[in-house]
């Protein structure tokens, strides 16, 4: 039969393991007219009315106390089977998920709610994409209502089971994805990144910490406005060996005018070294007032190779000692030492 179940051989097992709903009904089936006349001489050909007017078919009914309607769950409860039997002969057998049900409503008295009729129409599409129809007529309206309620309950159970199966499938997929660890895959060595790779010394770019940069810029601007003296400054000597090799985050100031001074014990001993006049002329970063002060305090030194010492003026010594004993110079010196300590004071030793 077109549209019948392909799992008819499992019907008996399903009936043994599931709850069965049963009703005594009247049954009718719609039979389509053939598309072409039959060549058999016994069959009477169709007239023009049947060929060219609706419904292009006829209803065949069976009204007997032996016709029964059954609703039974599938063995694995994936669907529900609806079957119509004439005695032990199966007339219709379908999954309810493949069927469309129509229940006409009627009202005998105006003002009262409508009630469903005793007849229910069922349609489905067969393998040839042709719509097939049959009708179920119950003995009472209450019996029809009971069938509809049972049908709704079964359909609701199918929807809940489908939703639960979908959730279980989703959980299974999520569990599989969580168990999968892409880091276990073998990555070619050429594609691996080695951020800790030692780079050549000449290609190293020091990294400045935000806090040190901010404090150093603030101290640099404050020191430029207060510094008025510099001792033993030689820009040709770069004293940054440890900052280059051991402390990559050490901050360097190549364009800063912060003076570099000797350790405090040398000032207390009164020892001071002074650069030559030619060296002072090569320092463009010093303030004009500071350069003028040093140029006026030191005598010109000769450029002869044999003459390496500069004669010291006693008045100049007393003037330097006077500057060293001044409170403003001591405050400036303490600020410079504090800056050196904050950016790493051990590199000057």
Curated annotation (Swiss-Prot):
<protein>
    <recommendedName>
        <fullName>Protein POOR HOMOLOGOUS SYNAPSIS 1</fullName>
    </recommendedName>
</protein>
<keyword id="KW-0963">Cytoplasm</keyword>
<dbReference type="Pfam" id="PF25349">
    <property type="entry name" value="PH_PHS1"/>
</dbReference>
<comment type="function">
    <text>Required for accurate chromosome segregation in meiosis. Required for pairing to occur between homologous chromosomes. Acts in early recombination steps and ensures pairing fidelity and proper repair of meiotic DNA double-strand-breaks. Regulates recombination and pairing of homologous chromosomes during meiotic prophase by controlling transport of RAD50 from cytoplasm to the nucleus. May affect pairing of the gene-rich fraction of the genome rather than preventing pairing between repetitive DNA elements.</text>
</comment>
<dbReference type="GO" id="GO:0005737">
    <property type="term" value="C:cytoplasm"/>
</dbReference>
<keyword id="KW-0469">Meiosis</keyword>
<dbReference type="GO" id="GO:0007129">
    <property type="term" value="P:homologous chromosome pairing at meiosis"/>
</dbReference>
